């Protein structure tokens, strides 16, 4: 038996990185999956490798698009049990508050903050209709710590996701809907590797602050998401669920 047998999961940002890993792992564990992404080709590639999944094109910043994704999933599988709100962006023009444009700020907030809001707004009613479920909102360790090398819009967006998750957890606790903020540390994703590929010295500067001395593998983060999606976490809600290799615990790291 799989840990998610009989569950229906909506996963955004499923075209790559942690979203893709989640779609494959959740499907392996028995779930039926909506693999949603703004890039339909990438979503279809993920769905094709999963045991039971379908691809759906979604713009999480667009309300009609999010509503259509939830409705399509519920119609196909007769309901929804798990929301894995993973889609997010971290553009290169998001930097210091002194340099980041209002346009860049708004673009990040639209996807990272508004996107999670819309997925919860239009997804939670489907969970309520099933008698409960699990919402996993992907925040970040930067919602806990500040950074001298700033991505001000991204950091603010992830702080908003963390606060939103706590409030939703309290609001829906007695209706058996659990809401948790998954806070990954730095993860070996194409996006992050491309950033460090242009500046290898930046990777080495950061490595000194990671207790493990390495980036997380996407599957290591998604294993935490699997726990939150499963009934094993039935008494876990409102949590700041850190999977960060000890980063937020560190004052100094090993020599």
Q: What residues fall within each predicted segment?
A:
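Residue(s) in the substrate-gating loop at a strand-loop-helix junction
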Residues: 140
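Canonical Rossmann dinucleotide-binding motif of NAD(H)/NADP(H)-dependent dehydrogenases/reductases
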Residues: 3-34
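Substrate-binding pocket helix/loop in short-chain dehydrogenase/reductase
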Residues: 94-97, 101-106, 206
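A glycine/serine/threonine-rich, flexible loop-to-helix segment
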Residues: 99, 150, 174, 186-210, ...
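Alpha-helical segment proximal to the catalytic Tyr-Lys
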Residues: 125, 170-174, 234
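Short C-terminal tail/terminal secondary-structure segment
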Residues: 90, 94, 226, 237-255
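Active-site helix of classical SDR
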Residues: 120, 157, 165
